[in-house]
Amino acid sequence: DGRPFVLEISNPRIREIDLDELEKRSNDNDMAGYNSLHFVQREAVERYKGAAADKVYRVHVKADGKVNKEAVVNAALSFKDANIDQRTPRRVEHRRADLVRKRKIHWIKADAITDDSFDLELETDSGTYVKEFVSGDDGRSVPSFSERLGIQCKVETLDVLAINYQEPMKG
């Protein structure tokens, strides 16, 4: 699916551009891939900025101790439509207001479970701090996956698999 984005170029030197050619040339390297490039009006930019977007992630998690497969699966299942409270994470508190935000974990599936690691696929509300949800961020994310599992865990890799935009109400 990819991650939608808006790019504004102020005072461009070239005013006419072939988006198909730009897309082709941009995709000639392995850094990133682009598709469906198109021009939009300012109103579309404002709608995009105001849209909520539930996201589906895949994370590889490392545990501080030995994990039990059944316990990981049960912890994952316990978060079906679960509400969590997330205080602004330490890693972003220098640029975000220190608030407690209410978020929802829609579902979690666990797999690739070994003695001390596992993968989670999960869908969350827009704005959920997934790394902090898994680790607990020293009690700033409650409940956390680590808390439910009973073992401290840390996200080693995180991939966004899908972004499900809900266009804001017009009016």
Where in the sequence are the language-model features?
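RNA pseudouridine synthases
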Residues: 1-171
